Amino acid sequence: MATRSQNVAAAPQPPQNRGNVAALGKQKAVVAGRPDAKNRRALGEIGNVMNVRLPEGKPLQQAPAGRTANFGAQLLKNAQANAAANKQNAVAPAAVARPAQRQARKAPVKPAPPPPEHVIEISSDSDQSMRQQSEGSASSVRKCSRKKVINTLTSVLTARSKVACGITDKPREVIEDIDKLDGDNELAVVDYIEDIYKFYKVAENECRPCDYIDTQVEINSKMRAILADWIIEVHHKFELMPETLYLSMYVIDRYLSMQQVQRRELQLVGVSAMLIACKYEEIWAPEVNDFILISDSAYTREQILAMEKGILNKLQWNLTVPTAYVFIMRYLKAGASADNKSDKEMEHMAFFFAELALMQYGLVASLPSKVAASAVYAARLTLKKSPLWTDTLKHHTGFTESQLLDSAKLLVTSHSTAPESKLRVVYKKYSSEQLGGVALRSPAVELCK
């Protein structure tokens, strides 16, 4: 075996390329001629199939058969080193020449494209919204050019329709700050006056008198008007606070809504109701004997006190209610802000209509805020104020002119018939010079037509 290996190793073999198929076939033929060729298979040299990248024109030298693996590995190492050196020599010039090629490519300047034509498209609102969304997403990519937004034909036609209908020409509501002059007045509670009147608006819907005349057997609306006329006269003679008058009428109507009263006790109800209101509102309230004298001793002390207790129990001692008086004061302030002055005549005229409203049974079930707004509206109409109903008044009252017309007509009618009426206490009271003689003004009969 050693002699055979030496002979094979000593025999010179021509150099063979990697892809030389003829030499490989010859080698296979020699191996096939051996006696044990059928029992075992010859192993090829690793160096013959090694994939080594060499420069062009230099063939790979194949290791002679029979050499050890160390010689093939050494040959492979040398070939890889030569390939790496040749590769560095070949890449360096290309890397140097590449910037020149890039600069040469940037030299030609392309002409600027012509500006795109603006086309107005007619599309639906949904298409327009989708287009706007797509444009919004693409705006981050196209930051370099921002074009002016072009209105579509649909938006143009919509705007023209609004102009034709007068929608865009409608001015915005101008709400005056009616409390700006009371900033230094601690009693005006400017910081939460709006919250107070919001509470009044909610509270006025509770514990309201209802339409009770049909439930009363011996009392009608005319008798109630007579009682109201007498209460107003007593209030004026005693020179009581205005809050006392409105609270007295509330107690009367509220009690009559819950309890049937005989005809002979109707005035007793009025006397006891005024006594309750005086104790609630006045600093120096009249005594029971004063009411006995003013009623011409029609009732005794015990009767007045017993009726007082009965009324309070029926009302469950609930006397803290907003009346028309608190709303009138607020609405007059809003009207004075609109007129840019404090009008005393306007104040007297508004309270004149408010006291006429106390005698009208048709306004018993109305909200105090609506009665107050109707009184202010009728007063402005009688005094020919312009504008008649401002945005500030609408904001603070919560009512429009159309909502106040029916109540205002009733008040203006009462004003026109007051001089010939038998119940003339209110008319005489406001005909005096002390209250400006506002009752003598010509009524606004044009509202009743």
UniProtKB/Swiss-Prot annotation:
Residues 1-34, 90-143 are annotated as: Disordered. Residues 90-102, 121-134 have a biased composition (Low complexity). Signal peptide: none annotated. Keywords: Cell cycle, Cell division, Cyclin. The keyword Membrane does not apply. It comes from the Eukaryota. CDD domains: CYCLIN_AtCycB-like_rpt1. InterPro entries: Cyclin, Cyclin-like_dom, Cyclin-like_sf, Cyclin_A/B-like, Cyclin_C-dom, Cyclin_N, Cyclins_cyclin-box. GO terms for biological process: cell division; G1/S transition of mitotic cell cycle. One of its GO terms (cellular component) is nucleus. One of its GO terms (molecular function) is cyclin-dependent protein serine/threonine kinase regulator activity. Belongs to the cyclin family. Cyclin AB subfamily. This is Cyclin-B1-1. It comes from Oryza sativa subsp. japonica.
